[in-house]
């Protein structure tokens, strides 16, 4: 009952422009629109993002129109339609193009809104509970929501060395050698696995740059939304 497609950007985002990587490395959204949404579509769990969607009027009227309880009304509306048993289809072909965010502050502001909205949906209309969704659909939606909570553990590990130097506080109480023996194999394995799975859609090194910069800004609003989603 719904059809979604890709909205492409023909200008570099702030990271691509400042680091000189435009058209040289995959854009931040390439993984989501290239693999994740395609995978969601396999389980009838793809959701529309922004303007690139066609929705039948009757199903939309049945759920009371576009969801306005959260700031990510597109994903929330998709969830409600899936709960009612309606199906979706995803076209992995760019149907529209526009400008990417032109400044770092605008880019961060956009990601803050996405992060806050997805956590709001998790709290107000949790896909793990309630009727209407298949098990695979629940997992697809939860995966999209939990992604934006990654800023919290990332901040903890980024500030752990500083906490030790200033306050002699241990995040993990163990000798450095033991930490290396347990952590390094995991980090190497995770990096190689991600690179293998993501392939041309995302490069691990540049992904870490995006995620590290954004973590400082999306962690506070997602934490607040978890506690008070309204």
Description of each model-found segment:
Residues 69, 78-96, 184:
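Catalytic donor-sugar/metal-binding loop of nucleotide-sugar-dependent glycosyltransferases
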Residues 100, 107-125, 205-222, 226:
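Intracellular alpha-helical coupling/juxtamembrane segments of multi-pass membrane proteins
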Residues 92-106:
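Active-site donor/metal-binding and catalytic loop motifs
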């Amino acid at each position: 009952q719904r059809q979604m497609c890709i909205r492409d950007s023909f200008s570099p985002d702030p990271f691509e422009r400042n680091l000189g990587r435009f058209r040289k490395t995959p854009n931040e959204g390439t993984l989501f629109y290239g693999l994740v949404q395609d995978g969601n579509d396999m389980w009838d769990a793809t959701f529309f993002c922004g303007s690139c969607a066609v929705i039948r009027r009757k199903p939309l009227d049945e759920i009371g129109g576009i969801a306005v309880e959260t700031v990510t009304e597109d994903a929330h509306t998709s969830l409600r339609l899936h709960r009612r048993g309606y199906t979706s289809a995803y076209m992995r072909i760019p149907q529209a193009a526009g400008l990417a965010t032109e400044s770092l502050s605008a880019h961060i502001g956009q990601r803050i809104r996405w992060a806050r909205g997805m956590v709001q949906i998790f709290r107000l209309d949790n896909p793990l509970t309630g009727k209407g969704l298949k098990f695979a659909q629940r997992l697809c939606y939860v995966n999209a929501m939990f992604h934006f909570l990654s800023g919290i553990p990332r901040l903890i590990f980024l500030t752990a060395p500083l906490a030790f130097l200033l306050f002699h506080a241990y995040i993990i109480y163990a000798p450095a050698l033991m930490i290396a023996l347990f952590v390094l194999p995991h980090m190497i394995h995770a990096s190689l696995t991600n690179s293998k799975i993501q392939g041309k859609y995302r490069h691990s090194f540049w992904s870490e740059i995006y995620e590290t910069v954004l973590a400082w800004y999306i962690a506070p609003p997602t934490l607040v939304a978890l506690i008070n989603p309204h």
